[in-house]
Regions:
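Active-site mouth of glycoside hydrolases
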Residues: 28-31, 35-191, 201
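Boundary at the C-terminal end of the N-terminal hydrophobic targeting segment
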Residues: 21-24
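Generic N-terminal leader/processing signal
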Residues: 1-3, 64
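Sec-dependent signal peptide recognition
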Residues: 3-9
């Protein structure tokens, strides 16, 4: 009887260990970079931005979409859409680009309360992939220690409540922002990078930076208006539809 109890106990311990290793979303170092697993299933994210025509996106092979912010009710709607279309959500948490606000206790306390509520409300939702703390905050004047220290604080806050989902931030194509993340926000699971014209240079830029973690392309497309040639009166010259088609194909591969 004693041996039987020991055997049952060992089985329970093993089952518990297996369950904990499979539950949740993790990023792990691999031979050729990083791999993402959802409940033990290796998953390659093929995402779109926003919630417009998710039916077509899903039919085309997309398995995730990204948002830039939202309150509890809006996020519930996003997650319901994700469930309906068998997709995952990278849910944004809006952050200011105004550097002064990162010295403002009123703003920071408001953000702490908001983030705590979101983490507690959605910590077990299986349609949620990740939290994205801020979008390109460095494009204002907030590529400063105070801002990134606060991103790190919020990341730690989320992780103390939500053990299932990943936590990230999204930056523009900006090597200095990568260095800031590496220095001030080590708790992030990955960095999202928004890039258009120099899509093929991203890996090299990451390799040259101080950041050594995982990254995900979170926005991409035709060359941005701020990257194209301009007329003599400084108006950007938009790519033609055919040029856009070509760069979509080139940059996707």
């Amino acid at each position: 009887m004693k041996k039987e109890k020991i055997f049952i106990f060992i089985c329970l311990v093993l089952l518990s260990a297996c369950s904990s290793s499979l539950d949740g979303i993790v990023i792990e170092k691999a031979a050729d970079g990083y791999k993402l697993s959802i409940d033990g299933r290796e998953t390659y994210i093929k995402g779109v931005g926003g919630t417009y025509r998710l039916d077509i996106a899903a039919q085309s092979g997309a398995n995730a979409f990204r948002t830039w912010g939202g309150n509890v009710e809006e996020i519930k709607k996003n997650l319901a859409l994700a469930s309906e279309h068998n997709m995952y959500v990278m849910q944004g948490i809006g952050m200011t680009k105004d550097s002064i606000r990162y010295y403002d206790d009123e703003y920071k306390n408001k953000m702490r309360e908001e983030v705590r509520l979101l983490a507690e409300t959605f910590k077990n939702d299986t349609s949620l992939l990740a939290w994205g703390i801020g979008n390109e905050i460095e494009l204002g004047n907030a590529n400063i220690a105070a801002a990134w220290n606060f991103v790190e604080e919020l990341a730690q806050l989320i992780k103390s409540i939500d053990k299932r989902h990943l936590v990230s931030t999204v930056i523009s194509y900006n090597p200095s922002a990568l260095d800031s993340v590496a220095k001030y926000a080590p708790s992030l699971d990955y960095v999202g990078i928004n890039v258009y014209g120099p899509m093929g240079e991203v890996q090299a830029v990451v390799d040259r930076s101080d950041y050594k973690g995982a990254f995900m392309i979170t926005e991409w497309g035709p060359t941005g208006w701020w990257e194209t040639a301009s007329t003599e009166w400084k108006a950007p010259i938009e790519q033609t539809s055919e040029e856009k088609r070509q760069v979509y194909e080139e940059r996707y591969t």
